């Protein structure tokens, strides 16, 4: 079973309108929860300033204020694959979180795999993030 996990901003009420706004903005990820609970996954862009502003999935951000991307694992031993414009730029096994630097403008996203499940599930993504757009 695939599930869409919608991210609603903390200052917004949990209602139909904020739900629709979050989906329109791309503030969500897809989790194949039949393979395990994906609640708690996170993929954000982190700003350069002192406040380290966070840019969530679906956000558009200029390249200049962006220092890194961070992804949070929901369990140890997961394989994360980072993409830019559809091509793989980074792949690693993660126990809690990982970060990588943006490589210029483009469309960035991550996929998470559970290699511990073995074939055929280790070849299909468990979590698919929505992209962050770097302009």
Tell me the role of every PLM-derived stretch.
Residues 1-135:
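C-terminal functional module detector
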